[in-house]
């Protein structure tokens, strides 16, 4: 705790130095981070992620390293323009003055990152925080210790402690950090823990970004290309072993295409991972025994609540392995239809009318993502207008996260605030309003004493301006 307090004090004192840094100085720090992730420590990160939960090297490159590099490149290209004051209109009554908005750093920031994409969801927000001119303390997840250790090396090699520091450890470290008056907290994790983080932040009135989760519905109607829908959903669901906050969480399939969809889904899953999935080098593992047992409990509950296993259902306890699993026929009481799954199990429900789907989705919390496979513009329009979600992909899954020109985040229970690109820069910035008087102020005419003439001028101003 002493080290944490000392670093927090040092960063608090250093925040104005970083806050006044130029775009080129911030870009220099981003270049150093990019080089470390892309080149110097790339192999170390690949090996660490494989040790933590057998993440395939290609998936590490595609879902961990590339997104960070892509984010940094976008920031470097646009940062100078983002930092410029934004001129805005000034009402006529304030003639003789100008108005503008400046982006100032929030100050000392805390990033609490998760285990499912530890590199991506640590260094992505860090890039935004650096771009905005903040000092940062990072608390990575203890569930991926090998990766956390490599990230600690990177932070120590690239930054001074008063600029960026990383503290490894369990929940007690996070609790110690949350007791401090950070200016901003960026948390990625579950809604349950998100509420704890927000409660701690409220004690200091710290602003928060909460990237949470939820049950992301995936709709397929009869007009969709069934084969393509099955392929893209299987890919999005089983990527990272289903441990993705925006993974398809449950399927809503139009009744008439159920059997055709299941056949196509099984075909593509086998193509991705072969007949013997447990031996595939492209299929990862559940992060630890606790989460493995949680998922097995879901499978046991499904059997008691009408579930029919259409595919998979196999597991190897010694490896934290669960095969890609598709389940249909569940009753409303099944936990798979209530809890965010965060694993390679996908429940399937059918519908006859799109209105049923909309009502079902709206009966729950707003999801982090919603996926719709349809060729009908009217259906697409109807679903978009009558549901709420943090993000949506139409005729694809998961890909919306990878576009750094789009804001990424949830809505209410699935999150507060946005990340990526300009939106991430703004999230770590305070939009400071400035009015600059440079000549006579018309407002002086309306200052006390309030004479009859000033009353008429006030009425005239209200009417016309």
Where would I find each of the regions flagged by the language model?
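N-terminal Rossmann-like NAD(P)+-binding subdomain of aldehyde/semialdehyde dehydrogenases
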Residues: 1-100
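ALDH superfamily catalytic-core signature
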Residues: 192-331, 394, 455-456, 462-464
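Short, well-ordered beta-strand elements within core beta-sheets of diverse protein domains
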Residues: 13-19, 111, 218-220, 250-255, ...
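Conserved C-terminal structural/oligomerization subdomain of aldehyde/semialdehyde dehydrogenase
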Residues: 21-22, 314, 321-465
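Residue-level signal for inorganic ion chemistry
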Residues: 26, 72, 133, 164, ...
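Residues at or immediately preceding the N-termini of alpha-helices
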Residues: 4, 23, 42, 226, ...
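Structural signal for hydrophobic packing residues in well-ordered secondary-structure cores
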Residues: 15, 34-37, 41, 53, ...
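Rossmann-like NAD(P) dinucleotide-binding subdomain of oxidoreductase/dehydrogenase enzymes
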Residues: 92-228, 351
